[in-house]
Amino acid sequence: MKILVAVAVIFFISTQLSAEEIGANDDFNYWSDWSDSDQIKEEMPEPFEHLLQRIARRPKPQQFFGLMGKRDADSSIEKQVALLKALYGHGQLSHKRHKTDSFVGLMGKRALNSVAYERSVMQDYERRRK
């Protein structure tokens, strides 16, 4: 055991001495030469730059499919305004379903309006007690 400790100590001392010898040479001083003003910035080659731009480009919104399914690619502001007018009685009734104040998700039905939700919870509680 004492022999292993002695070998380890000799190894560490020899590495320390060799590191000091290398550190004394100025030829191996890499970090002092890293200034941007002295180096010429190389432009990326055109195909490589084009490839990076394609990778970094954001996908179009039509490419996303969420939990609610695929969205219409041609939905526009005018269609949304017409739908809102139809829902609130300012136009003809649309063929799309009516939006209500509740949301049916994976965790069950939830109200978007907190006051209405609290009222419905209290009504459900009263019905269960009877």
Curated annotation (Swiss-Prot):
Cited Pfam families: Tachykinin (PF02202)
Signal peptide: 1-19
Claim: Magnesium is one of the keywords in the record: no
Modified residues (Methionine amide): 68, 107
One BP annotation, GO: chemical synaptic transmission
Propeptide segments, given as residue ranges: 20-56
InterPro entries (alphabetical): Tachy_Neuro_lke_CS, Tachykinin_dom, Tachykinin_fam
Record's subcellular location: Secreted
Keyword Secreted: yes
Annotated keywords: Amidation, Cleavage on pair of basic residues, Neuropeptide, Neurotransmitter, Secreted, Signal
Site, Cleavage: residue positions: 59-60, 63-67
Any single Gene Ontology cellular-component annotation: neuronal cell body
Molecular function via GO: substance P receptor binding
PANTHER family per the UniProt record, alphabetical: PROTACHYKININ-1, TACHYKININ
Role summary: Tachykinins are active peptides which excite neurons, evoke behavioral responses, are potent vasodilators and secretagogues, and contract (directly or indirectly) many smooth muscles.
Family as reported in the entry's similarity comment: Belongs to the tachykinin family.
Protein name: Protachykinin-1
